[in-house]
């Protein structure tokens, strides 16, 4: 699984430079769109990096003229150093830039440097960004580069969403990058409303899954042509091709069929899109509607009854279930009329989703929970944090009730009004 704490897990040192003779001159023409793929694979995903590159090459005939698909590739393979390459329309991998030293791809400054270099190599009017690697939504350990890993086999560094948002905003403020046309997160648990709010100034759309995704990630042979579309054609094309691929049991390999036999029943990957121009309205509406919860919103130390609502992450490090479906929460809290009013705003901010009540989870407690999820609730494939008592929430290394306050969304929610400090 591409899982836990958004993160680009990479084990190496600092960027020092590159050999001029190994790198190609910056083209003078400006393309219509360049899609940047940030492949942080210097970890336990290293072996599947090139599998996805090959899939991209299979779909490369769908790249329009005057558009580019460019990948930053960082793998844990011998003495190989990170490099930037273009997947051409002719299904070739054309190396554009080679680094001579390893560096932490999870360092926000290095993240910014790589994206800036891509804009120099393949300048365009519009840019899209694919985040490829490990992730776990809004969960943070600190607001600096964490010194220990939450997942994997090596000691590595991680980048939190707040840091990513600042890095992208810095590039935007410097006129290096315009506001991104989209961010497609091909990593776990990224579709939480907290992330959408944090990234609202740097991208038009955020797409991905609120849950774990398969280790193989997106079927890029089908996804690549969708990356160069716009509006609803863009997000529906990506979501539908991703969802339909895994819903077809014939597309699963032997190990997937053996490990997750329930996938034969047509389950897939929950997927959604956030339209960031409406996320501020959704924050304000949700803040107000919490006050109107039927019977009143519970005061500390009580919290809403979330029983049977789908949650998208079971954290085995502290035995906590977290990231409950936002739409289902609000449906349970509100009267029918108030939910209808709130849902009007929600559907503007989350215009499309495909739900599955089971997915390829590596966690046994999560798999057991699938049978308890209420299929009659309205799900929106975006999670929302709710403060609660208990392991993982009130104490421990992650202490969700405290660390969630790093995010602007939870500052708008103002959980203190319900007694949560």
Give a label for each model feature.
Residues 13-34, 386:
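Bacterial Sec-dependent N-terminal signal peptides
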Residues 31-34, 63-70, 123-128, 176-182, ...:
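Loop/turn elements at helix/coil->beta-strand transitions in domains of secreted/extracellular proteins
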Residues 4-13:
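Sec-dependent N-terminal signal peptides
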Residues 31-42, 91-101:
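Acidic/histidine-rich, surface-exposed loop or edge segments in extracytoplasmic proteins
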Residues 46, 59-98:
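Active-site-surrounding "flap" and adjacent substrate/cofactor-binding loops of secreted or lumenal enzymes
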Residues 73-92, 103-175, 187-188, 193, ...:
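Catalytic-core segments of thiol-dependent peptidases
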Residues 120, 144-185, 190-421:
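Terminal, contiguous helix-loop blocks that mediate binding/assembly
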Residues 1-4, 19:
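Positively charged n-region of N-terminal signal peptides that target proteins for export
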């Amino acid at each position: 699984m591409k899982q836990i704490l958004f993160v680009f897990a990479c084990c190496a040192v600092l960027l020092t430079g590159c050999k001029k003779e190994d790198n190609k001159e910056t083209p003078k023409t400006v393309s219509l769109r360049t899609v940047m793929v940030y492949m942080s694979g210097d970890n336990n995903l290293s072996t599947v990096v090139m599998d996805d590159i090959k899939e991209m090459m299979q779909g490369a005939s769908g790249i329009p003229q005057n558009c580019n698909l460019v990948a930053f590739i960082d793998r844990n393979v011998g003495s190989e150093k990170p490099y930037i390459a273009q997947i051409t329309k002719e299904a070739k991998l054309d190396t554009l830039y080679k680094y001579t030293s390893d560096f932490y791809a999870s360092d926000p400054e290095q993240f910014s440097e790589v994206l800036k270099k891509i804009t120099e190599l393949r300048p365009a009017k519009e840019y899209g960004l694919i985040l490829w690697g490990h992730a776990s939504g809004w969960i943070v350990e600190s607001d600096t580069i964490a010194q220990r890993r939450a997942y994997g086999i090596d000691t590595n560094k991680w980048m939190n969403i707040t840091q990513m948002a600042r890095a992208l905003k810095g590039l935007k403020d410097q006129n290096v990058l315009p506001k991104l046309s989209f961010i497609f997160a091909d990593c776990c648990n990224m579709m939480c409303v907290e992330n959408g709010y944090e990234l609202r100034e740097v991208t038009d759309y955020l797409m991905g899954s609120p849950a774990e995704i398969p280790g193989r990630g997106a079927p890029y042979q089908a996804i690549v042509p969708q990356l160069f579309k716009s509006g609803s054609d863009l997000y529906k094309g990506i979501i539908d091709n991703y969802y339909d691929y895994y819903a077809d049991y014939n597309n699963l390999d032997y190990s997937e069929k053996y490990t997750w036999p329930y996938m034969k029943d047509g389950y897939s990957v929950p997927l959604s899109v956030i339209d960031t121009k409406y996320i501020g309205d959704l924050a304000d509406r949700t803040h107000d509607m919490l006050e109107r919860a039927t019977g009143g919103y519970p005061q500390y130390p009580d919290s809403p009854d979330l029983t049977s609502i789908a949650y998208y992450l079971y954290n085995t490090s502290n035995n906590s279930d977290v990231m409950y479906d936002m739409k289902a929460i609000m449906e349970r809290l509100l009267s029918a009329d108030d939910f209808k009013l709130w849902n009007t705003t929600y559907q503007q901010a989350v215009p499309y989703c495909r739900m599955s009540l089971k997915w390829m989870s590596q966690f046994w407690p999560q798999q057991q929970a699938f049978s308890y999820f209420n299929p009659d609730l309205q799900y929106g494939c975006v999670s929302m944090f709710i403060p609660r008592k208990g392991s993982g929430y009130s104490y421990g290394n992650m202490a969700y009730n405290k660390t969630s306050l790093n995010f602007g969304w939870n500052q708008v929610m103002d959980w203190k009004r319900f007694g949560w400090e």
